[in-house]
Regions:
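Short acidic/polar active-site loop segments enriched in Thr and Asp
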Residues: 18, 65, 276, 313, ...
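Thiamine diphosphate
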Residues: 1-240, 244-249, 321, 348, ...
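DG-centered beta-turn motif at the end of beta-strands
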Residues: 73, 249-267
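Active-site regions of oxyanion-processing enzymes, predominantly non-cytosolic
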Residues: 155-160, 336-342
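A short, acidic, amphipathic alpha-helical segment used as a generic capping/interface helix at domain edges
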Residues: 320-333
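A contiguous pocket-lining binding segment that forms or flanks enzyme active sites
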Residues: 277-317
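A short alpha/beta connector and helix-capping loop motif
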Residues: 83, 91-93, 263-284
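Residue-level marker for buried hydrophobic side chains located in beta-strands
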Residues: 205, 251-254, 281
Length: 379
């Protein structure tokens, strides 16, 4: 029987958890929403899974037991503080990880093919105890009881959560979004993509994982589009490598606030090398739209100020649908790198993912063939 969101958070409360930090997954959309108004357990939206684990460890050091909620596709981000902080310092933290792409790789998206099957083996190799929470298995209270002696011994305990083990309840999005004086009719992601495509000619376009890539694919698929599936937070770095390798071409990055927050240090690298042929478009709707509309921390983050301080030559803030196309035109005429922060709203058509029609390897190969004129094939 699936665990309801309220039962999930109640179980955490009953087991003494006093703080939860995490990165959203649709498997946990309901519990994260429930935590938003739970009086005794603050929820800390983390930039990435590693910072979530570190935050939980810090809470435990201060005497407040803590838990982490994460998607298995972000397990790689979590490995570093797991192996260099939590394990060597023997800090007991409870970690919930969704098992996308498990038990069959075909049950998830392409980026879950590898991580979906290796998390239990990796935990075994690190001698980290883990339990499964299944729709037809022992309930959450029983599973958490099994973690008590593990945590009491100073070790982390992992609960791997299968699809359907927690009820798929509608997540509640961000509260009223923060706006600035002069903000107008905010675009949704489809409005943004439509405006960008109206101005793009020979440019190469990288789009971040999630609904932005779906919107780009459904509105204007072409070989010069690279659709990220997974690798959240790395699209700007991917584009930077191409921009430095091919200075005669122009590159556009379609990014999101959650993605930029995940690895925001990449902005300083882009600013340091300052490729003049890079236009970085950041769609800031202040939610993780692809996982159910959970709030990011972007409402208190001034991306334009950060980009200026990181060395971007040009930074512009746009907050109306009508202003997007002129801003793209200005960016194409100017020397980059440009960061165009587009204050947007949640919503837009979900659409089909690109890999439903074009395989992930083919996305890379056709893009590279266009970029290198077929002279340096990937394989």
């Amino acid at each position: 029987v699936s665990t309801t969101s309220k039962a999930f958070v109640t179980a955490l409360d009953n087991h003494g958890i006093g703080l939860v930090s995490g990165v959203p997954c649709s498997y946990f959309g309901g519990p994260i929403s429930e935590l938003a108004h739970w009086p005794d357990i603050p929820y800390v939206p983390a930039a990435n899974e590693g910072t979530a684990l570190a935050t939980a460890a810090g809470s435990r050091l201060a005497g407040r037991p803590a838990a982490v909620i994460a998607q298995n596709s972000g397990f790689g981000n979590l490995i570093n503080p797991l192996t260099s902080l939590v394990l060597p310092y023997q800090i007991p933290v409870l970690v919930f990880v969704s098992m996308r792409g498990w038990p069959k790789a075909s049950s998830g998206e392409p980026q879950h093919h590898w991580m979906g099957r290796v998390v239990p083996d990796w935990l075994d190799s690190l001698d980290v105890p883990h339990r499964m929470l299944l729709p037809d298995g022992p309930g959450l209270d029983e599973v958490l009881e099994e973690t008590r002696p593990v945590l009491a011994s100073g070790r982390p305990a992992f609960v791997l959560v299968a699809k359907g083990a927690v009820e798929d309840e509608k997540a509640v999005g961000a509260p009223d979004a923060e706006t600035r004086p002069g903000d107008g009719d905010l675009p949704d992601r489809d409005d943004l993509v439509k405006a960008v495509l109206a101005e793009v000619g020979p440019e190469f376009v990288f789009s971040t994982t999630g609904y932005l890539s779906r919107s780009l694919f459904n509105q204007g698929d072409r070989p010069r589009n690279f659709y990220m599936q997974g690798s959240m937070g790395h699209v700007a770095s991917l584009a930077l490598g191409s921009a430095l390798a091919r200075p005669s071409e122009r590159f556009v990055v379609l990014d999101g606030d959650g993605s930029v927050l995940m690895h925001m240090g990449a902005l300083t690298t882009v600013g340091h090398f300052a490729p003049p042929n890079l236009v970085h478009v950041l769609f800031d709707n202040q939610v993780y739209d692809s996982t159910g509309g959970q709030a990011t921390t972007a409402s208190t983050t001034e991306f334009d100020t950060i980009a200026r301080g990181s060395g971007y030559r040009r930074v512009q803030y746009v907050a109306s649908t009508a202003a997007v196309r002129p801003a793209i035109q200005d960016a194409f005429r100017a020397e980059g790198p440009t960061l165009l922060v587009v204050r947007g709203r949640a919503g837009g058509a979900a659409g089909e993912r690109a890999s439903g029609a074009v395989t992930v390897p083919e996305i890379a190969r056709r893009f590279s063939a266009e970029l290198t004129a077929g002279q340096v094939p990937l394989s």
